[in-house]
Amino acid sequence: MSYLTKYIDYFKSFTIMENPTESSRRDMEILVKNISSSLTTFTRDPIGMVVSSLMLLLVYFCFATTFIYKGISLFIPSYCIYHVLNSNTNQEVKYKNILTYFFIYSHIEFISDILETVGFGLLHLKIALVIVLLYTVHYRNEWLEMIYNKIVYFDTIGFYTLFFTYSRLIQEYNKFRQTVKIKKNE
């Protein structure tokens, strides 16, 4: 009898019984330990690592959805903030890093929404960017700070450009109104 059939039989018996016995729980623990030990011995081999990496890559490309993206990008940082808030230690660095993450994440969302309206679907790229950002939040704070500073710099350039363009547009509009008024009075 294979592990899979034992697993299925166990769950069938679990749904039939209201209160599973201690022996059935112990059997389930043994079954899970056997499955996990067989998986860890498989991935210790270099060929096993290559096969498991290819399987994960296949799963990544086949099952990447917006739900998974939102789960990764919003649930994990929210969960980290929950743990930081519940701990009694003062971790201002973690607060700052996670808030910086949300700032960068909002820019990723804004840019990707603009590109998706044009017709570029960037879901896989967004998932990869969010995973890299989560890595920088926990392990590479200087990278996160560098990305934040670059975004603030380009935002400043963008806002000044928009401001000057808007003021120039208002000036041209006022000139146009003046010429229309003059020709209307003639």
UniProtKB/Swiss-Prot annotation:
<feature type="transmembrane region" description="Helical">
    <location>
        <begin position="114"/>
        <end position="134"/>
    </location>
</feature>
<feature type="glycosylation site" description="N-linked (GlcNAc...) asparagine; by host">
    <location>
        <position position="34"/>
    </location>
</feature>
<keyword id="KW-1133">Transmembrane helix</keyword>
<keyword id="KW-0812">Transmembrane</keyword>
<dbReference type="GO" id="GO:0016020">
    <property type="term" value="C:membrane"/>
</dbReference>
<keyword id="KW-0472">Membrane</keyword>
<feature type="transmembrane region" description="Helical">
    <location>
        <begin position="144"/>
        <end position="164"/>
    </location>
</feature>
<protein>
    <recommendedName>
        <fullName>Uncharacterized protein L606</fullName>
    </recommendedName>
</protein>
<feature type="transmembrane region" description="Helical">
    <location>
        <begin position="47"/>
        <end position="67"/>
    </location>
</feature>
<keyword id="KW-0325">Glycoprotein</keyword>
